[in-house]
Amino acid sequence: MKQYLVIGGSSGIGAALVQQLKASGYHTTATYNESKTIESKGINYVHFDVLDPNSTLEIPEVLDGVVYCPGRINLKPFHRLTKSDFALDYEVQVLGAIDVIQQALPSLKKSESPSIVLFSTVAVQTGFTFHSTVSASKGAIEGLTRSLAAEFSPKVRVNAIAPS
């Protein structure tokens, strides 16, 4: 049975994806970052905080896919943003993805057809009002995606999607 790991799988797009993977019969581990425990039959939910260096993942021996989609958006006018706002988005979106990929890569390489999926935003390409922090961090995700796709090819597929 294929094994998938969804970071940020407790709400939004991540939760919908987890349900789709479950319906397709795949074994799925999904992370959440709320203080309450989440339970769902057929899905292994684990607490994981991408900002906590002591938070670790239990990754299966063989992993077929990783989806990195923690939810965070800070919509403010540029003049009200601080360097800390930009740093937090970068830490969650980019450094968190790097950490998860580095932890998962040995298990991904043992799969026949592994895949990593990251999330960007159309705001990177088109520019949206009040999207400075998310556009900056997701722009970095797009660069990371291209770099890792070239580096890991042809064994591991790496893609980013940009929902509107």
Give, region by region, the residue ranges found by the protein language model:
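Alpha-helical segment proximal to the catalytic Tyr-Lys
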Residues: 106, 149-154
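A short, exposed helix-loop element centered on a Lys and neighboring polar residues
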Residues: 101-102, 146
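Active-site loop-to-helix junction immediately N-terminal to the catalytic Tyr of the SDR YXXXK motif
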Residues: 81, 127-135, 147
